[in-house]
Amino acid sequence: MNPIVKHISAVTFAVRDMARSLEFYRKLGFEQLYGGRLASFSSLRAGEAFVNLALVPDYEGQWWGRAIFRVEEVDAYYQALAEQGLAPQLPRDAVWGERFFHIADPDGHELSFAELVK
């Protein structure tokens, strides 16, 4: 049998402060499915994207890569985040056919939001 991977089911991020992280991800448009401000584990969803947050109070953030989320109208999404007081980098075009921007969550996890350029 050859297993066929369909997609990533969820990405789990270590966080130092669950309440702070939940607020950040809510501003990104994620809704809480499980857990909460006092929980050690929370699950969130935005569209078909799932993110888990695992409380690790002594987590020392270190760059490991980034999670990339597909969005429509990346410039409008960027503007909406900036208007909420978040600090996304300016959107830019990539040679591989995407327009994207990066933003770091409160624990330093790099997130990228991208749309395909036609």
Place the predicted regions along the sequence by residue.
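Vicinal oxygen chelate
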Residues: 16-18, 67-110
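N-terminal beta-strand motif that seeds the catalytic metal site of vicinal oxygen chelate
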Residues: 1-20, 67, 116-118
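Residue-level marker for the onset of beta-strands and adjacent loop->beta junctions
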Residues: 9, 39-40, 65, 97-99
